Amino acid sequence: MTSVGILILAGGEATRLPGKLALAAGDLPLVARVYRNFAQPGRETYVATNRTFAPELDALLPVPAVIDRWSRRGPLGGMLTTMARMRSRFVFAVAGDAPFVTPALLALLLAELRPEVEAVVPERRDEDGKPFLEPLAALYDRAAFLREGLPVLRAGRGALQLVIRRLRAHTLPVADGLTFTNVNTPSDYAALLQALGQYNS
């Protein structure tokens, strides 16, 4: 059985929507809903963050929270800091504001694993048909990510795309845009609430 840990990204400055991870998404705050999607007894699960949570939110996340060693370097810093603490061979990284990312997507990514593959990353297409990746809903070989991610960060860069290029990565076309819905602005949040209503109906 493949050893897979869960890494929930809950850092970021959220300048356009402060406190977004604590906003209600159905019956739970946004980040707690993401945690619930993947919570399993015995599954290694961590939260990467750049701040301590309010007690009421912290109580809904009964897993270790790791403070990012590299502030203002994007999700890469939080992923590297947290993966260094983890033990699972593979890590599924998921954004804390993406409540429609579910174990069904993780199962699809796991099915694409091969001995030589170091990352499986969903690929979508924009309105013009140009492909783009979803690195915050992706599966990574933990040791390989640490090996290739640290040089990128130490070179003064923070782009996950650069790390993925250094990995033996496999992309998986995924057409369902709802899965990757996240929240950066008040209008995003309004759209998410509308989508949640349709999703739960």
Q: Predicted regions span which residues?
A:
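Nucleotide and nucleotide-moiety/phosphate-recognizing core
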Residues: 2-157, 165-181, 186-200
